[in-house]
Amino acid sequence: MITRLWNKFSETYWQYKFSGSNVRISNSDGFVIGKGSTIQNSNVFVGRDACFFIGAHCILKNVDIYIEKGCVIIDDYAILISEKPINKAMYIISNGNFHVNHHTKIQCDRVWIRFGGNVEIGSYTNINSGSEIRSDESVIIGSYNQISYDVNIWDTNTHTIYKSEKRSEITRKYFPYFGYEIEKPLTSPIVVGDNCWIGERSSIMKGTQIGDNVIVGYNTMLLNKIIESNKRVVQDINLRIL
């Protein structure tokens, strides 16, 4: 009787934890979910060479998380969510690490980490939908930041430029995976300080370092730029009327 009651309790407990979700763990020691945390309408895969540690009172909702190699740590009261239940947010950790500090809300469409990349996001930071983080080296985002919609943060060229013969050879070998990368592209780390506001449709590209209390205006692109603290950055647009 006690065994049956315990099994029923466990079944109900995990159904609540993983409401409408598929969770596949290849490494039993590599997955921990804290008190009061839930995974809703999501898909999670943790490979043999990976780990996924979720703190207390976290919410993961409408997300697909695939961790092939590396570690993902979600601290207490953090939220990973998409407002689009059908088109879920994608978190792909092919090889690298991803750390979200406490009381942070991420609504990115995609986070993609490869080639041993590292992404760390501080506390009380919000990233809105449509945004994307790609790391093949290092992206460090501080605390109390507001990152708007459709913002791209890439520390990588994402692709290596080959001669046409080499790219054709790779395409044939790895078909149907077009654009397959066999070596790490050019990269340079990104740092965003604390209390920054990154405007809608901005692009923070490789090699950019942003200090504290910086505002980046709408549709601004930063590549290999150093922005000192307490600055305002806008894209220079020259309007011509012909």
Stretch-by-stretch model annotation:
Residues 1-155, 160-161, 169-178, 182-213, ...:
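Domain-scale signature associated with acetyltransferase and cell-envelope carbohydrate enzymes
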